[in-house]
């Protein structure tokens, strides 16, 4: 299989690494974990080679990972609501929480990109609420 090499923002790279770390904690299937660990190793290696780490970047990474961990739980809870055909107040709250957390996630990724001088920046624009 051919490799596809694509430049990404530092925020996107850290976001992906944080998600892979959460997957390593949550997923139990050994075959899936093998792929997850391999991808994590590749991305972490590139991060260490290309990005100068500091305490502020580590703090932002930890915030990003915390948000992604919350999103993981919320998505599991939403799937349980789907299974139970329960689309009441709990489902609505969970759905709203997703977009609030994703807004926070986008802000942190932009802050990471600004801090690291990333040439690529994920720009978002949403309807105000």
Predicted feature locations:
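Extended, charge-rich alpha-helical interface modules
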Residues: 1-129
